[in-house]
Regions:
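Bacterial N-terminal signal peptides that target proteins for export
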Residues: 1-12
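Bacterial N-terminal signal peptides
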Residues: 10-20
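Short, low-complexity N-terminal intrinsically disordered segments enriched in polar/charged residues
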Residues: 20-59, 63
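A solvent-exposed, acidic/Ser-Thr-rich amphipathic alpha-helical stretch
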Residues: 54-105
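Short, cysteine-centered beta-strand-loop-beta hairpins and adjacent loop/turn segments enriched
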Residues: 94, 122-130
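A short hydrophobic beta-strand element
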Residues: 98, 112-120
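Hydrophobic/aromatic beta-strand elements that line small-molecule binding cavities or substrate pockets
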Residues: 101-107, 120-122, 134-140
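Short beta-strand edge/turn micro-motifs at domain boundaries
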Residues: 132-156
């Protein structure tokens, strides 16, 4: 009888461990998929930004889209509204030609939201750095689409 009880306890304990490890593996897979989706969205953001393509850039975001910069908070409710911004003209007047990520560090992750601390650099047409900024990007999955939903930047 004692052997049967011992086997039963061992079996229950083993099943519990199996269920816990399965849940942890699923959680890790969800987090890895979320990080991959968020990083792809950030790549899309930078490629469309450097291409000076306002519609593609707007499509790399989720809405409402929020940007904290230069002491202000700007909210765009739609891709159409965002695509009307004059960011490219303003940046080109300041000597900007293109940008790229220096670092991207995931600091929080769930299956549908990833917070990424970034450092990016802006360059002139001679590929000389003109500025470097830290930012925090919040990338979300909305209706199956990964896109940047909020940015807080030290850039003007």
């Amino acid at each position: 009888m004692k052997l049967l009880h011992s086997l039963s306890t061992t079996t229950i304990f083993s099943l519990g461990l199996l269920l816990c490890s399965s849940a942890m593996a699923q959680s890790n897979n969800e987090e890895e998929e979320a990080i991959a989706g968020a990083m792809a969205a950030m790549d899309e953001f930078m490629v469309s930004f450097n291409a000076r393509d306002p519609e593609a850039w707007a499509a790399s975001l989720n809405y409402p889209h929020v940007r904290f910069a230069s002491g202000t908070v700007t909210v765009w409710d739609s891709a159409e509204e965002f695509a009307q911004t004059d960011s490219f003209e303003r940046l080109q007047r300041a000597g900007w030609d293109h940008s790229h990520w220096l670092t991207r560090e995931v600091i929080l992750v769930s299956s549908e939201k990833v917070h990424i601390s970034t450092v990016f650099q802006r360059f002139n047409r001679d590929n000389q750095p003109i500025s470097t900024y830290q930012s925090l990007y919040i990338v979300t999955k909305v209706d199956g689409h990964w896109g940047t939903q909020a940015r807080s930047s030290m850039a003007p």
